[in-house]
Amino acid sequence: MHKDKPTLNLDALRDSVAFSVRLSQAAIDAIDVGTTLDPAGDAALAAARGYVAGGARNNALRRAAMDAYRAAQRVGAGPAFHALHSVSAAAGAAFLHPPGGSTDAHQTKHILGAAVQYVLCIEASGGDSAAAFGSVMTCIPDAIKELLRMYPEPVAGKQRYGAVLVMLYRSIT
């Protein structure tokens, strides 16, 4: 759970983005073969990968995340919607705030957002959400577990996204 004065470093941010990129790619791979992902999704995934490889946490990365988010909104629903949101979350994971602020519970979305969207993508594809959840659980590096323990449990809210977010958080921490 929330520790006294934990710190957040660049390695933790890069680990979080790398984890998110992995799940975003899995979401993209899960959508129908005939489905073409909006170019904004490809750009956001490339930007996130660039960050993991040592690139800057800058406005271009933030814009790529927002462009993928807007592309998802244009799609509206279905597997491609969730795949685009997963990619947006991967690029946005670089903007995690250090623990200790008033938005701490919200920050878990930066860490687990791509994972949540991966599970929702599998569900929207008619796949087994329990298997998708299991896939997420088997690929979580220790660094992400440690990072999550710095933040309080998120609020589930009324949507499926929030329920999956809380289930993942509880299972990991």
Summary of predicted features, one role per range:
Residues 1-137:
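Structured binding/interaction patches within domain cores
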Residues 143-173:
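Acidic, carboxylate-rich catalytic segments that either coordinate divalent cations
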